[in-house]
């Protein structure tokens, strides 16, 4: 079931580039542990956290030339930007991995996450996923 929601224009606090294969592997691996993933950007690092009754797992990716993760925009490096999202939906989005080498992740507090795949000369594919409510 898909809801059509109007998303107002916004300036994102954090925009980063990450290898698409790393994002796909991370989402697939963590989807075995939980239905929800917390994504947090703080300083020069990105954290992916899942938890359930038996296990907590956090994967931290620091900005580095070697691992391919880089901030394109980081308006407030001291601000913590985070949200909880459906990992099942992120795994579905990651099926576009073969379209490009790197993805862009747009993050802002209390706002949907946007994942952008640039497809060579054809354009781009953007996926938007609203944060999960804790209600």
Residue ranges, per PLM feature:
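Short acidic, glycine/tyrosine-flanked loop/strand segments centered on an H-E-D-like triad
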Residues: 1, 63-70
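Structured all-alpha helical bundle cores of eukaryotic regulatory proteins
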Residues: 1-15
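DNA polymerase processivity clamps
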Residues: 12-65, 74-135
